[in-house]
Amino acid sequence: CFLVRSTLIEGASHLLSVDPLQVEAGIEQLALAGRVAIEDWPHDPTDAAVYPVDLMLAEDRLSHHLGLLTAGADQERASQRAAHAAAVARAASTMGISLAEAQEEAILVALSGGVVVVTGGPGTGKTTIIQALLQASGWSREQVALAAPTGRAAKRMAEATGYEARTIHRLLEYSAQHNGFQRDEHDPLDVSLVVIDEASMMDVQLFDALARAIEPGTSLVLVGDVDQLPPVGPGSPLTDLIRSERVPVARLDTIFRQGEGSEIIASAHQVNRGEVPAVTPSGTPLQDFYFIHREVPEDILGTIEALMSERIPKRFGFDPLTEVQVLAPMRAGAVGVINLNLRLQELLNPEGPSLNVGGTTFRLRDRVMQIRNDYERGVFNGDVGFVARVLDADKALLVNIDGRAIRYEQAQLDELVLAYAVSVHKAQGSEYPAIVMPVTTQHFKMLQRNLLYTGITRGKKLVVLVGTERAMGIAVRNRDVAHRNTLLAERLRGETSQRLLEGVQ
């Protein structure tokens, strides 16, 4: 969200070949003009944090509204604990389940108002908490709001709970006409409980908008996996909220689905512990996780093609067009997103009516992805569909997205890309029956533990990794993800100082 002033001065003076004093003077002028905000940096009193104004305001407001939501929650929990514990016990009995202590505590906290974070890896019971919370609360469906950052995550949430679930943008009634949300502190959500799934995907600005629309006294439950990739946008507010130690955090570490023999779940947790999954020996009986050793990118590519065209359809019965998603850490290279899409399109859908747009050929039946939010048409970044008709005379396409026929005129086709292969970042918040993922040192810059972990956890029934133990080892040992400069945790703890220059009101 910000740059440390000394780092900004050094970097800008080097990039622009100007005296550092000129850069420093320029920063001061920007602050006086209200273009940037400068704050004391708690970690070094001789330095400062330089923010774009909108990000500083978002952090500041978010801290303020989270403070309002958590005020008085501890007293409420103590006074109502016995009644809430009885409600949770009844819910567990009705559902025929036994809740772990961490799960039960998370539900008790959520029933008492305030903010609670539920974080855990795959198979640790996050969805069970949401289901039991809804059962125990006694609130009507109109009193509950379920949402997620992406349409696909919201759809999965609805399927798991039987409740309506929306994107956060829909929940807050985003208006393209007004370029903003209709729900805020002046017109808040009229609900008693808000549950957000895949909360680790929220950036600071989206979280700010959400918190502004929730009245004090409302329960806010944030469910996510902080070990996945951070948000694409600025900040990492779920991580900061946990780091602040200002809200209850339920850390789920017991794997409840382990009894089903899921190697996907076991391997994901293995990666998260910094361990390299073993290469799958030849002749291994059918299972749900495989690591196939291949050294060079061309061999990795050939193996992925064989998996998609023959091995997975024949051995597991998955349709490679609709049920198998190839994930890649990067766009470039032999096994990057761009080349994989070209090769897989030619392999899986080589013929049929087509339309060439800006160097991309779209064919009938192609798997495609929307890459921008379009609120007027109700299609969002990350939505996946299939080309249903090629309207060659109009230079347009009809795309089937979740059962809806969306027409793309020629001017809108830059919102579509081929999606036989997508980046791990694009796949976050989604799940697929099967995924295939290259792991190669060609993607050295992106070999990170949280990226590998996120990729593995996208697969529900089958995960196949293709690459080298060396690349896997680099990834699982690399926890040095790009650091996010934020002060949200410090704001929540009351450790930030007044702005040095009040250029912003």
Name what the model sees in each region.
Residues 97-111, 313:
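Pre-Walker A adenine-sensing motif
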Residues 215, 361-364, 380, 427:
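Residue-level recognition of short, solvent-exposed, well-ordered loop/turn junctions
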Residues 104-107, 113-282:
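ASCE P-loop NTPase helicase motor core
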